[in-house]
């Protein structure tokens, strides 16, 4: 899954208005889904299932807030159900978000809804764009805020076999514009064949836009990624390395995806 934008200035104006309506409520980045949206969505009438999993063998050992999931040794994941409504719109449901701590047991973390608007046929465009709106309902150990949301613009360029994609994300905890959190993700990929690609991805969290965190308190993680697109299932796997003290030192991610009809 990933994003493309609807066609024409009328849709663009509607998306901008929707984004502005969301801004008065700020957020924090999620850790169940480690992915750069690339402008591609399910075809109209198609139901797609994507399984997101990430495991942190060497992560932060202190909770982000009292009672929070401690990242070290935890497996986080979620099934994502996506339905292609039309060539420029995909609706999604993430259910259930879950964590499996190193000590064992299963923790349910909540669920998410999303609306992804994109430029149709993004895979065939030299420049593509889109906008994702996400609404999260969180368990107390997953996020201190019971409701959060995400505003994810999508900008991408295809340069021959290379791709450059930027998602300048604003996480929103519904506490006002000044509390919006800037957590961009970036991907530079190279398509070895129509089925195989390699990429470098960076996931960052600078903190709230009213005042970014000090550099050593920010989160910056660099992933080496391999993608396979084809039958019977699409696969994305990667290894991430923390670049700052406030980042998990080592994270493994696996994303499996296929159409169900």
Locate predicted features:
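N-terminal signal peptide c-region/cleavage motif recognized by signal peptidases
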Residues: 24-26
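Hydrophobic alpha-helical transmembrane segments of integral membrane proteins
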Residues: 20-21
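Transmembrane beta-barrel domains of Gram-negative outer membranes and organellar outer membranes
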Residues: 28-261
């Amino acid at each position: 899954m990933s994003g493309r934008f609807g066609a024409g200035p009328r849709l663009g104006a509607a998306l901008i208005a929707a984004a502005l309506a969301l801004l008065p409520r700020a957020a924090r980045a999620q850790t169940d889904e480690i992915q750069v949206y690339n402008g591609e969505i399910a075809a109209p009438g198609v139901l797609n299932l994507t399984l997101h999993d990430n495991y942190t063998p060497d992560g932060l050992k202190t909770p982000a807030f009292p009672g929070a999931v401690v990242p070290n040794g935890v497996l986080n994941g979620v099934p994502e159900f996506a339905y292609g409504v039309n060539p420029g719109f995909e609706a999604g449901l993430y259910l259930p978000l879950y964590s499996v701590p190193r000590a064992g047991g299963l923790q349910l973390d909540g669920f998410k809804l999303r609306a992804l608007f994109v430029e149709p046929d993004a895979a065939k465009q030299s420049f593509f764009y889109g906008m994702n709106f996400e609404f999260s309902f969180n368990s107390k150990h997953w996020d201190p805020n019971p409701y959060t949301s995400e505003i994810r613009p999508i900008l991408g360029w295809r340069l021959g076999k290379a791709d450059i994609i930027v998602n300048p994300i604003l996480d929103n905890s519904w506490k006002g514009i000044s509390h919006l959190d800037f957590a961009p993700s970036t991907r530079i990929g190279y398509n070895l064949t129509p089925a195989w690609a390699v990429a470098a991805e960076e996931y960052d969290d600078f903190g709230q836009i009213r005042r970014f965190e000090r550099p050593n308190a920010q989160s910056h993680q660099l992933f080496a990624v391999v993608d396979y697109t084809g039958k019977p299932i699409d696969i994305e796997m990667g290894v991430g390395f923390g670049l700052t003290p406030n980042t998990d030192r080592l994270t493994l991610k696996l994303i499996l995806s296929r159409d169900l009809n």
